Design a protein with these regions (language model features):
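Catalytic cores and adjacent binding grooves of peptidoglycan-active enzymes
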Residues: 269-337
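Short, conserved helix/loop micro-motifs enriched in His/Cys and acidic residues
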Residues: 205-220, 265-268, 272-287
């Protein structure tokens, strides 16, 4: 009687255990399927590629456990496989959150650059005759962008992937709107300020910080943008070899105010402020014979200046809009036109 009872209890107990193993196997199968989906969706969306490799290995491990006979699983169980798979899944999910946060941070950084340019142009166009509506549109775009940026800052602490992705996308959209509004304002200013097609309004014109300018060594009251000075020095050295004297520099970088005082709307000689390459530190006016077409000095410069990154622009050529033999520019001056 005792033996019979024991058998019955063992049988019942064993049945319960078998049921538990089946349920546990279902859990592992479900978990594995979810992990496989995560492996697929996480492609290109993690910061640590090794987490996906780890997940892939744990999925293979889980699959091999699931392929084992029920009897084997009865003795070994699936607990280890489930725990390892869960840890690998967590690692991928954490890496995906990090990746999504990185996208938001990147979007915020690129927003900052667009914002800086927009604000510079907004300020530079104040009181310059541009339609107020065009400026108001940029201001509105900047306000909307600032709000999105503040919201994104809060979202950064979220672990919700969809929310993070939405924040990054929204920042990108806002940046585009600000960029378009900035270009519209810049074009509007250009249209009313720079009458000639070879001129381009630039918010930096006449406002180059002194740290970005460099003194011309043989003409110390004159400055050009620091990055174009080495070419000018080399050009001068070659010129000196040919003519025994330095290039005569009569004009170089001009501040916004000095360009404004030179500008005479009834004469094409000086460009309106904001439209001159002198204001960018990329132009010099040269004398010592160069101020006349077809002199030896002018001809020499025409033949040699480009070797050193300097050129005589089309508008100043004989027959150009303003024939100015003396006006020379860095080749960089026309890069943006
Ligand atoms: Zn000039």
């Amino acid at each position: 009687m005792i033996i019979v009872t024991l058998v019955v209890v063992l049988a019942m107990g064993g049945g319960g255990f078998a049921w538990f193993v089946v349920a546990e196997t279902d859990d592992l199968a479900t978990q594995t399927a979810a992990a496989e989906e995560l492996l697929a969706t996480s492609e290109g969306k993690v910061t640590e590629q090794s987490t996906r490799a780890g997940l892939s290995a744990q999925i293979a491990e889980a699959r091999s456990v699931l392929d084992e006979s029920v009897l084997t699983r009865l003795t070994t169980g699936t607990g280890d496989a489930r725990e390892s798979l869960e840890a690998a899944t967590d690692a991928v999910e954490a890496s995906m959150v990090e990746f999504a946060r990185g996208r938001v941070t990147e979007a915020r950084d690129s927003l900052a650059a667009a914002q800086a340019r927009a604000e510079k142009i907004y300020q530079a166009t104040e009181g310059q005759g541009v339609d107020d509506a065009v400026r108001a549109r940029l201001q509105a775009a900047l306000d909307t962008m600032a709000a999105a940026d503040t919201a994104a800052d809060t979202t950064l602490s979220s672990e919700d992937l969809a929310e993070l992705a939405r924040a990054a996308d929204e920042l990108g959209t806002n940046r585009s709107v600000v960029t378009v509004a900035t270009e519209a304002l810049s074009d509007a200013q250009d249209a009313i300020t720079c009458p000639a097609p070879d001129q381009a309004w630039d918010p930096d014109s006449g406002k180059v910080p002194s740290s970005a300018l460099a003194e011309i060594p043989w003409a110390p009251t004159h400055f050009v943008r620091a990055d174009v000075l080495p070419g000018l020095i080399e050009l001068d050295a070659a010129y000196r070899e040919a003519f025994g004297e330095h290039l005569t520099i009569n004009s170089s970088y001009r501040t916004y105010e000095s360009q404004a005082s030179l500008y005479d709307p009834s004469s094409p000689i000086a460009a309106p402020p904001g439209c001159s390459n002198h204001g960018l530190g990329l132009a010099v006016d040269i004398g010592g014979g160069v101020e006349t077409f077809d002199t030896e000095q002018y001809t020499w410069l025409k033949q040699n200046a480009e070797t050193y990154g300097w050129t005589h622009p089309d508008f100043a050529e004989p027959g150009g809009r303003v024939p100015e033999p003396w006006h020379w520019e860095s080749v960089l001056a026309r890069a943006g036109l």
